Amino acid sequence: MHWKSSQSPRKKKARMSKSEFKAMMIVFFDIRGVIYIDWVPEGQTVNQVYYKNVLTTLRERVRRRRPDMWKNVSWILHHDNAPEHNALSVKRYLAKNNIPVMEHPPYSPDLAPCDFFLFPKIKSALKGTRFESMDAVKAKATQLLNSLTQDDLQHCFQQWKIRMERCRDREGGTTLKGITFRLSDFFQ
């Protein structure tokens, strides 16, 4: 055993310096894989105008990558309660384009698949890696996203279902356009 006084200097620990690269992405995915990744340019604020442009691109990607869902209008958008998602112009855009939205309870990151599954998975895979450029960060993150298996995504959506049902059972019911629904209707 080694004794130290309260005046002894602290033991030095090696710490990794913070990265000089900060990347923000907006990701849309379903049980079959990633549909669209938008890399937000450095210095860009994600406001309602920017988000509407993202949604326009998303619609095109759904049409091309999920034609069966596009034809049947069987895809539902789930996003959290960020101000740009709830802006009147965004809500009008969604209504005009017949994009159904699954409401998200306020202040509930535990109910957002990106927050409890996707971003932690990517962050832990990138932790400790040094990148030479922003393009290298984007390439690695995109590769990680595209390498998610259907089992990974199935697990994510099963966890989401469990979390949402727990919320509903605790009187935090979920509605879509004023109609209460069972979450099992959306999961296979």
Model-derived features with residue positions:
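Surface/interface recognition patches
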Residues: 1-188
